[in-house]
Amino acid sequence: DLDGTLLTSNRVVSEFSKEIINKIMDKGIKFYIATGRVYANTKEIMESIGIEVPLITSNGSRVNDKDETLLYSNPIEKKFINDICEIDYKKHGEEIFLNAYIDDDWIVSGHLPEKAEIKLEEWNLDYPMIMPLNEIATKEISKFFYIGEHENLLKLERELLDVSNGELNVVFVSPDCLEVFNLKSNKANAIRFILEREGIEMSEAVAFGDGFNDYEMLQEVGKGYVMGNAFYRLSEALPDNEVIGTCDEDAEAKKLVELFL
């Protein structure tokens, strides 16, 4: 995982982590990235580490080989997109804003709040495309995500679960971010797909994560490590998994040293 795991709270990979990743790969250890981010942004992070690996993006909805070839894509089914776009999410909290990913394009409905614009500058992210909901409803969507206060998103979560009737993934990746994506898509399924191509068993893999979108991945690999800064639902759901340090303590890299160097 990237945000809250490999990346620091400043959304960068530390020099120590870069060094360790390259060292384990030099020893022949396979290393993969599995994130909720889109491909283009994930590729930039991969390049900052100085490696070329297959990328699992949009929470397992898309997998690209290291030569950029799209290996598979599982967008949200069209029948759900209209239902989601018809939800009056603002009734749960005026601060909530709706985002969507169309391929590698980040879309925001309405306008981007000032607080979010400040974060864009802090994290050096590109400005999203602004698009009305009725136009978003006509597109092929990799995932939706809502940003807002946690207590308000909890109310929205209940409505989304009712609307989807359990046929979509509705998960918190962090307290202030609620994501919606194809039920068949998760990081574990995407990892299994990549490992099968490499002739590797899931039981031979280790993984690191902090959000509930990491749940299946951490549960199904041989050893799943929960970050010390993990979202409370993830920690509660995986009480037997080892908890390591935080993303600002290079906890993943330190565990990789312990395991492989």
Model-assigned labels for residue ranges:
Residues 1-11, 218:
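Asp-based phosphoryl-transfer active-site loop
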Residues 6, 31-34, 55, 180, ...:
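Conserved SAM-binding loop
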Residues 10-115, 229:
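Active-site phosphate-binding/coordination module
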Residues 14, 179-261:
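Mg2+-dependent phosphoryl-transfer enzymes with acidic/Ser/Thr/Gly-rich catalytic loops
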Residues 17, 42-46, 156, 160, ...:
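Hydrophobic packing residues within well-ordered alpha-helices of enzyme cores
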Residues 28-32, 51-53, 142-143, 203-204, ...:
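Short active-site oxyanion
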Residues 49-51, 59, 163-166, 220-221, ...:
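Short, structured coil segments at secondary-structure junctions
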Residues 87, 92-208, 214-215, 229:
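Conserved acidic, metal-coordinating active-site core of Asp-based
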